[in-house]
């Protein structure tokens, strides 16, 4: 009886202080106080955490998303002036009195003649860039087009040298404002070169364009030899 009291009294005292954990070590009971401080040294001071050496450098992360678009910057410096444009067609007659009529037999001077320097193939406008004659400046070598400056009747002729040798043929059309007005064909009959030629007389109004368009095949470029040529002139004005 006395032994039971000796065991029960300590248990009642500890249970009144709070929850207590204990373990059995053989025949001895070890009581653990949950309120005891943790992570302290022998003198009650906080225990220091041992420092570890730095690890290896990690890899570069992925690139982030692009940010919001910023405001437009200031305008840049002014660029150089462009090249002068082509002269426009003559305007309509003004309200003033008409000028004197041209003398009888007067013919305006409009004529051009140009050769082809570089080869062409496929489907493109032939730009006869080796200009020999351009009276009136109505022909433009950069575009290969003649633009009518005065209404009237005009004559045009073209001769195009085919670059063959592979069994193909070549077609060349004279165009007026995108419509075919004359055609020529050269066929490769076991030859390396052959000619396609034609001529036409057309009535033109101011601003009408006349040019030669390749409709398949290959055209030989003659450097300055002028194997392929395009020419035209006015016969009489309206």
From Swiss-Prot:
Summarize tissue expression.
Highly expressed in testis and adipose tissue, brown adipose tissue expressing higher levels than subcutaneous and visceral white adipose tissue. In gonadal fat pad, expressed at lower levels in adipocytes than in the stromal vascular fraction (VSP), which contains preadipocytes, fibroblasts, endothelial cells and occasional immune cells. Expression exhibits sexually dimorphism, with higher levels in females than in males.
InterPro entries, per this entry? C1q_dom, Cerebellin_Synaptic_Org, Tumour_necrosis_fac-like_dom
Q: Which GO terms describe its biological process?
A: ERK1 and ERK2 cascade; fibroblast proliferation; negative regulation of ERK1 and ERK2 cascade; negative regulation of fat cell differentiation; negative regulation of fibroblast proliferation
Primary location class? secreted
Secreted: is it a keyword of this entry?
yes
Domain C1q, first and last residues per copy: 105-238
- UniProt keyword list: Collagen, Secreted, Signal
Pro residues bias locations = 71-96
Point out the signal peptide segment: 1-15
Q: Which residues form the Collagen-like domain?
A: 53-96
What induces this one?
A: Down-regulated in fasted animals.
| Keyword Secreted on entry | yes
Enumerate the Pfam families for this protein.
C1q
Cellular compartments annotated? Secreted
Q: Where is this region: Disordered?
A: 37-102
Any Gene Ontology CC annotation = collagen trimer
A GO term, aspect molecular function:
identical protein binding
Q: What does it do?
A: May regulate the number of excitatory synapses that are formed on hippocampus neurons. Has no effect on inhibitory synapses. May inhibit adipocyte differentiation at an early stage of the process.
Q: Which PANTHER family match?
A: CEREBELLIN-RELATED, COMPLEMENT C1Q-LIKE PROTEIN 4
The UniProt subunit note reads as follows: Forms homooligomers, predominantly dimers or trimers. Forms heterooligomers with C1QL1, C1QL2 and C1QL3, when proteins are coexpressed; this interaction does not occur after secretion. Interacts with ADGRB3.
Q: What is this protein called?
A: Complement C1q-like protein 4
- Give the species: Mus musculus
């Amino acid at each position: 009886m006395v032994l039971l009291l000796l065991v029960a009294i300590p248990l009642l005292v500890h249970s009144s202080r709070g929850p207590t954990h204990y373990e059995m070590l053989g025949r001895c009971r070890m009581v653990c106080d949950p309120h005891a401080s943790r992570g302290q040294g022998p003198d009650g001071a906080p225990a220091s955490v041992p420092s570890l050496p730095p690890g290896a450098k990690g890899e570069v992360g992925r690139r982030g998303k692009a940010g919001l678009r910023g405001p437009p910057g200031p305008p840049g410096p002014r660029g150089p002036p462009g090249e002068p444009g082509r002269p426009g067609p003559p305007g309509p007659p003004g309200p003033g009195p008409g000028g004197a009529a041209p003398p009888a037999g007067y013919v305006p001077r409009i004529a051009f003649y140009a050769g082809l320097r570089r080869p062409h193939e496929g489907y493109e406008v032939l730009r006869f860039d080796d200009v020999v004659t351009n009276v009136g400046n109505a022909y433009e070598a950069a575009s290969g087009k003649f633009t009518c400056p005065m209404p009237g009747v005009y004559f045009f002729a073209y001769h195009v040298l085919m670059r063959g040798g592979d069994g193909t043929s070549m077609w060349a059309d004279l165009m007026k404002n995108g419509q075919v007005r004359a055609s020529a064909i050269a066929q490769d009959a076991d030859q390396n070169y052959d000619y396609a030629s034609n001529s036409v007389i057309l009535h033109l109004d101011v601003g009408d364009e006349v040019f030669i368009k390749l409709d398949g095949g290959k055209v030989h470029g003659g450097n300055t030899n002028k194997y392929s040529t395009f020419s035209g002139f006015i016969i009489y004005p309206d």
